[in-house]
């Protein structure tokens, strides 16, 4: 153990890490002992040299060390990785429909910086940290073998490590096949709805699996009603509304590609007669609908992250307040609003406050139906605040009697 390179924390630093956090920042480190390579394994020590665990080192990143184990004597070998992968897959089998799901969710599965999504018989991988990038091939090989034990034969693997955050790790953005080439448009079924998922060109890994059960939750609220789905992407919420029995659904998105894919998905499900999509800027369309006196039984707001840093939170609050204000005004008395934020920096408390301000400005009352977060295959690891990012509310909009 003494031969392992180490980092030693400054006196008084590492509070978040000691409280369960998975990261150590560069400004918390007093010294580096030995000659570890970036992407290599280091022992983590407090100021007095007491061992706290082992993790990946990357001097090029603000996140200098990513935790692998709080056992400072852990050997990071194939057996270690197999235990991690097996535990992650078993957890999914315990908690979610695994036909399509997130199999590995980075720090929450103690494989920092790695995301693996399963779409039917295709795996999509996103590697966001230097250390895990070097173990990616081994982990994927282990996962393929593990799935085979359950009778699941992986047809292909596609890499979507094209996020800008890789540049902060000193890594290039990459995407492409990690297996023999295959048709990257994959059909999946979720909540009884069929989708064509483009794992090569779709947003992120191709489809937002984190909203799986939130989409299911709106189905009964849509029955027989008129539904507006804002920021529809490839139509998932809109199609779940139709699955729930909505009489009429309008899905809106500024992306022509997204609207085209949503339209195809509606046809795939035989819903084209009840679901239509429009390529429009939601911020422009909602005031237009209000001026026309349009009302809906259910309004769904699923915007992209308005902030990806603390510096832009104030601007994001303005955006969330505006979109919720406009959305609330379009809900019939007694109708429902489903609204969410996928930004970690928009805390639950701040998001709740912002919705409340929007309701006040709209002069409407909100009755909370339920509060939800991301689906269980995106587990929230307590102590790792960044693992909680999706906030999802359903409200009934009621006027004073």
Predicted feature locations:
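Mobile active-site "lid"/loop adjacent to the S-adenosyl-L-methionine
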Residues: 296-326
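Non-catalytic accessory regions of SAM-dependent methyltransferases
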Residues: 1-120
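Conserved SAM-binding loop of SAM-dependent methyltransferases across substrates and taxa
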Residues: 234-247
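Conserved SAM-binding motif I beta-strand of class I
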Residues: 248-253
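C-terminal catalytic and target-recognition region of SAM-dependent MTase-like enzymes
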Residues: 322, 336-401
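Non-catalytic substrate-recognition/targeting regions of SAM-dependent transferases
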Residues: 104-117, 136-208, 216
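Conserved class I S-adenosyl-L-methionine
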Residues: 224-233
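S-adenosyl-L-methionine
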Residues: 257-300
